[in-house]
């Protein structure tokens, strides 16, 4: 059974004062089952982030409908968790309090302090539980944003270029932590990324977009076992295939 469906979805942004229209997405049709890890790749301006915001319910389509378990998505809900390109932390709360507050919105029971400590330790922030956002680097703050959403275990985890601000080693570590969470709670992950290798490493399916207006150019299923070897011949073949479709 499909977990998420986009049926003939288009999105047009209008600038009323300038009488101008921007066609961000046009005629998007997509069906995704639960427990898939889907990455969306494509050039800038092809509507990748717009698609995530439509799925989250933050904005509504100009045409078509988006269904979660056969129910129309028309607003945000705790069933969907989203991590944006830039950290979105409450500056008046400590790192631990930020994580606890977000988790408590999803769960009626208070989040276990030990679980918070474990998650922070996994991403190298165990010593920063009592620090405030202004005391963190951009990459550290983004790791907190990821943990804050992860700990609530949403049915759909939406990631908008979440690892772009991290250094290479931290980025690879976070890729594995996100994969571990996905395999543990068996939810649906949808991630926007500009990194083709990252998409092949993490995904069961890759959606390749083309711009102006944003359309789906091709969908590629990645049939590789986890954990994946970035140096294997099959991995390299998938990476090269995606790059070729993107005209690189």
Question: Where does each model-flagged region fall?
Answer:
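The feature captures the beta-strand-to-loop junction immediately N-terminal to the Walker
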Residues: 41-43
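Conserved ABC transporter NBD signature motif
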Residues: 64-76
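A short, proline-enriched helix->beta-strand linker immediately N-terminal to the Walker B motif
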Residues: 151-155
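Conserved ABC ATPase "signature" region
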Residues: 110-128, 180
